Regions:
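Non-catalytic interaction/Regulatory regions outside core domains
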Residues: 2-8, 13-133
């Protein structure tokens, strides 16, 4: 019953946070395949978003090993999506392969912190035996 409740909570949260139109992106297609970093910022030039993108480029192999994808939504019209960021200029979410929110913050955290969180998860522990780098 707890998983059903978690699923309902996630769907409710996502309905509030994520725009109805995701440019054809349906998060269900990534369930059990990928972990997802979702970011929301006022615009594409937000300093935290830029820092995250730089850090992601520097850690490409680690991102691939953890099956991480990044989707960003902004209110500046560059993505064509309208989002609600709860009056915060930046929000980051980590969604696990099971579709549950594993981490949420209104401040940027280092990818190393997210990697450590991911690496502590049982599913990731199994995957680590087959890392590609």
């Amino acid at each position: 019953h707890e998983n059903i409740f978690s699923g309902i909570l996630l769907l409710s949260f996502m309905a509030i946070m994520i725009p109805k139109e995701l440019h054809g992106i349906e998060l269900n297609q990534y369930l059990w395949k990928n972990r997802i970093i979702l970011t929301f910022a006022d615009d594409e030039d937000h300093a935290d978003l830029i820092r995250l993108k730089v850090e992601m480029k520097e850690n490409n192999c680690e991102i691939l090993n953890r099956d991480l994808l990044h989707f960003h939504f902004s209110n500046d019209g560059k993505t064509g999506n309208e989002t609600t960021t709860n009056d915060q200029s930046f929000t980051i979410l980590l969604i696990g392969k099971d579709g549950e929110i594993k981490y949420e913050s209104n401040r940027l955290v280092s990818l190393i912190h997210l990697f450590e969180l991911i690496d502590s998860m049982p599913m990731r522990q199994d995957e680590m035996q087959h890392d590609r780098c």
